[in-house]
Amino acid sequence: MKITKTITYFERPGPENTADCAALAVERATELGLTTIVVASSGGATARAFAQAVSGTGIRLVVVTHAVGFSAPGVWEFDADLAEELRSCGHAVICGTHALSGLERALSRSLRVGGGSRTEAVAEAFRRTIAVGLKVAVECVLIAADQGAVGVTDEVIAVGGTEEGADTVLVIRPSHTASFFDLQVREVVAMPRNR
């Protein structure tokens, strides 16, 4: 058996692709009978766009934000009022340590310890050879699985972007970070051609 699907390629990465990504994510979730879209959103704009796109579809969002302290010590960048609004609609808003950096980044930045890490090498390989959005989408699924917001047996739609907005849509079978090599990127629905 084979499946033939169209992949959407954006000319360049960036937030101008967010609306298209939201529509494509909902469309592919509906086609596959999936009920969860995992989406990265640092401040809330992308989460808001996706919440509008899934309204009335029965699809649940798992919004994964930057960890507290990512931009500055003790600061959560996400719009707290929007988080409450999304939760009241049945969506999840979670934050967790970046699965593909976290403690490793502290070690590689240290002048005493120094050097790159294997985990950061995996992240950089995703960013450089495929797409930043793919790295983000994979990482968000790992975080969501580790937080218990998604299971590891059912596929999800995963959405990431480059700096702001969304530009990559994937179908992923999740795993926990500790079982990283069990994660499967099963489909690329959309991604930028140029990085």
Task: Locate each region found by the language model.
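Glycine-rich, aromatic-bearing surface loops/beta-hairpins
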Residues: 123, 154-195
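Internal active-site segments that recognize and position negatively charged phosphoryl groups
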Residues: 36, 126-160
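Long, charge-dense
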Residues: 3-7, 59-119
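Short coil/turn connectors at secondary-structure junctions
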Residues: 32-35, 56-60, 88-91, 150-155, ...
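Glycine-rich phosphate-binding "P-loop"
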Residues: 1-27
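N-terminal active-site beta-alpha-beta segment that forms phosphate/nucleotide-binding
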Residues: 27-79
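Glycine-rich phosphate/diphosphate-binding loops and the adjacent beta-loop-alpha structural elements
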Residues: 9, 118-132
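General beta-strand structural signal in soluble alpha/beta enzymes
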Residues: 18, 38-41, 63, 93-97, ...
